Amino acid sequence: MIVTTTNCIEGKKVLEYKGIVFGEVISGVDAIKDIAAGFTNFFGGRSKSYEGELIQAREEALEELKNRAYAVGANAVIGIDIDYEVLGQGGNMLMVTASGTAVVVE
């Protein structure tokens, strides 16, 4: 399946629009990762534990989006947008939402 942030796919004609599809993931950040990120914040640098959590959540959201596109008979998703939001009282949950337009291309 082709997935792209652009509104068209070069060299491909859109034959049918199937509608908007979404993939959502809410991921909790555990205490160990939170402590490691605190040290990184204090000493400077990148938090590999949070980055890994973010990457995994994004990949899962895109996979869910593709599965939903397949379910409506699409073979591509165009105009993909990915949004991130921190949730929970302590900001210990991450929501990743991927959205796009499911289409059938030639």
From Swiss-Prot:
What is the annotated signal peptide range for this record? none
What is the name of this protein?
A: UPF0145 protein CKL_2433
Reading the lineage from the top rank, the first entry is Bacteria
Q: Which species is this UniProt entry from? A: Clostridium kluyveri (strain ATCC 8527 / DSM 555 / NBRC 12016 / NCIMB 10680 / K1)
Q: One short Pfam family name for this protein?
A: YbjQ_1
What family does this chain come from, according to its entry? Belongs to the UPF0145 family.
User: PANTHER family, alphabetically?
Assistant: UPF0145 PROTEIN YBJQ
Sorted alphabetically, which InterPro entries does this protein's record hold?
A: UPF0145_dom_sf (IPR035439), UPF0145_YbjQ-like (IPR002765)
